[in-house]
Design a protein with these regions (language model features):
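Secreted, periplasmic, or luminal enzymes acting at the cell surface/secretory milieu
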Residues: 1-88, 94-96, 147, 151-155, ...
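Generic structural detector for well-ordered beta-strands
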Residues: 56, 61, 78, 111-118, ...
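Short intrinsically disordered coil segments
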Residues: 72, 94, 108-110, 142-144, ...
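Intrinsic-disorder/low-complexity, polar/charged segments enriched in Ser/Thr/Lys/Arg/Asp/Glu/Gln
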Residues: 72-74, 122-126, 163-165
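Terminal connector regions
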Residues: 130-172
Length: 172
């Protein structure tokens, strides 16, 4: 290949025709979410992509561990091209409200950045995340940012094995 692919899937892709869609942003539930036969993992998860090179993620950092609703959070992560070809990677930033009044998805994509890296090159990818982007509709259908703990995740796809994680606290 003269061209190194760098696209990412906009959906989770099932393993077989009979498997229901497995969404990256499914709601947390105590009910059984699997199947009688087979597992409930997709063949390829949301954000998955192919490349002729490999990338490694490291050093997820945030500038504050405690924030107010009107603050802006700066998130950064190091990405390295560990392969022998130049390539582009799409770094994905997810959030999760750990203790929400309403049921929210396990992961919510909040931002992404495309970064080009030469073989062996390492770059720090930075995100500016207004705290208000952590919000959602409450039980009265009003947009609100709840006080409490939120998980910030960065990686190459929505799969847990690919995500670096840290936690912040939102204060009212």
């Amino acid at each position: 290949g003269k061209v190194n692919p760098s696209g990412k899937l906009p959906m989770s892709f099932p393993k077989h025709v009979g498997q229901q869609m497995v969404n990256y942003n499914r709601k947390l539930s105590s009910l059984w979410a699997g199947y009688v036969e087979g597992d409930n993992q997709p063949l390829w998860e949301f954000g998955y992509g192919l490349s002729y090179t490999t990338f490694a993620y490291d050093a997820l950092t945030i500038d504050k561990t405690s924030v107010c609703v009107d603050d802006v959070l700066k998130v950064s992560v190091d990405v390295a091209n560990t392969g022998d070809r130049a390539g582009e990677e799409v770094v994905q930033l997810y959030i999760h409200d750990l203790y929400s009044v309403v049921t929210r998805p396990i992961k919510e994509l909040r931002d992404f950045r495309r970064v080009a890296l030469a073989p062996g090159e390492r770059k720090r990818v930075e995100f500016t995340l207004p705290v208000e982007r952590l919000g959602a509709l409450d039980e009265n259908m009003r947009f609100t940012v709840e006080a409490g703990d939120y998980e910030i995740m960065a990686g190459s796809s929505s799969a847990d094995r690919n995500l670096l994680k840290t936690t912040i606290t939102v204060k009212k």
